[in-house]
């Protein structure tokens, strides 16, 4: 339970930090990527389908899913869709080493939890994946409107930027 409270506090702190500063989205742009980075990101995309969250403790998993489901109920009225979204988000964020609460905040800002959101510059889906990422690390079969694909790309891209910015979340976001 203390892990759940700590995770919730971290998520709220990060959300407050993001809201305290005006958004300065510099926009993603295609940049040269080393073969090693490209290969690493491609391998990360090639994993198996999500079947559960990354929690090791089922009580923590149930508590997190219940609380996050309650918070998202107005934005995602269909409970089965909401649970699939949360399960996939938790797995993909954890897999990429990104706090799931941070991913939820990113999605709220980027797409308002709209699966088919498209930005004026062509970013797509929940995490607003830019088309050049699919070309750079994916393949033509990857659909950024597909839930698992979008959350996986979003988590990996966020992890990539966090690494580039040496853990500075403000700059990475």
Regions found by a protein language model. Give the residues of each.
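N-terminal secretory targeting signals
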Residues: 1-70, 75-80
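Catalytic glycan-binding domains that act on GlcNAc-containing polysaccharides
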Residues: 48-173
């Amino acid at each position: 339970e203390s892990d759940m409270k700590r995770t919730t506090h971290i998520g709220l702190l990060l959300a407050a930090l993001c809201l305290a500063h005006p958004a300065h989205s510099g926009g993603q742009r295609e940049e040269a990527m080393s073969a090693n980075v490209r290969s690493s990101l491609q391998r990360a995309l090639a994993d198996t389908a999500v079947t559960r969250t990354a929690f090791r403790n089922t009580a923590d998993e149930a508590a997190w899913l219940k609380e996050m489901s309650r918070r998202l109920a107005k934005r995602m009225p269909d409970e089965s869709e909401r649970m699939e979204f949360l399960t996939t988000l938790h797995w993909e964020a954890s897999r990429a080493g990104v706090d799931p609460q941070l991913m939820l905040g990113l999605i709220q800002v980027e797409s308002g939890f709209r699966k088919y959101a498209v930005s004026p510059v062509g970013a797509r889906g929940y995490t607003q994946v830019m088309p050049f990422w699919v070309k750079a690390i994916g393949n033509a079969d990857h659909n950024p409107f597909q839930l698992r694909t979008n959350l996986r790309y979003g988590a990996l891209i966020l992890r990539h930027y966090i690494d580039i910015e040496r853990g500075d979340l403000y700059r990475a976001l």
